[in-house]
Amino acid sequence: MRIHPTAIVSDKAQLADDVYVGPYSIIGDNVVVAAGSRIGAHCVVEGNVRIGKACEVFTGVVLGSRPQDLKYKGEASFLEIGDNNIIREYCTFNPGTAEGGKTVVGNNNLFMAYSHVAHDCTVGSLCVIANNGTLAGHVNIEDSAVVGGLVAIHQFVNVGRLSIIGGCSKVVQDIPPYSTCDGHPARIYGLNLVGLRRNHIDKEAIGQLKHAFKILFNSGLLVKHALGKVKKEIEQTPEVSYLVNFIANSQRGISRSCRQLD
């Protein structure tokens, strides 16, 4: 281990042999840091926190501090961070609230400076949370989603995989997979074509998704009727099936379209 002489690292913390801890950082008793990870200067990692392999934690990050929720009374809760995550300056991640509750972050994510992951959130893998992106409690971000800068996401919202949220948006309802959305409140603008192509979704599948989006967001039908029409008229490719199931299972409702979809 390479621990700067000004850092304070608990004897009870479990750090892999090659972990680096920078100046003036504080590592608490129940912290586990896996091989290849780096903790920058002036960081605080406290509580029940597990950090995976090859993570980069930059200056001023605070991981595992008490959840910002009035119902929390000191229960043992957890923060679990996977491998190859980049957590930039002054980000804050809180653990769960209930006894045994967890905030869970997957692998290969980028959290830009000042972003916040609140209690009981789940972030998948290959996501980007841009500067000052704010996830309230119990938010779920699926794989390969992009959250723009200064976005605020309401409690319990689900953000579907391969979706992208424009900067400064206010998100109060679920964001469907594969969508592009923006606004205050956020509204659907169409498919995230760039994201779909970058993830090697073929043209036929994209065409089926376009058809599904027109029915779901441009037909004027009630959601349950639009879902029935999609199931009846469109081939249930894996992408279409995932979209249908996501919308059918939404608890907060789905963000609606702001205009006619092409």
Model feature map: region roles:
Residues 1-6, 11-12, 17-18, 54, ...:
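Terminal amphipathic alpha-helical/low-complexity segments used for targeting or macromolecular assembly
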Residues 2-187:
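Structural signal for interior beta-strand "rungs" in well-ordered beta-sheet cores
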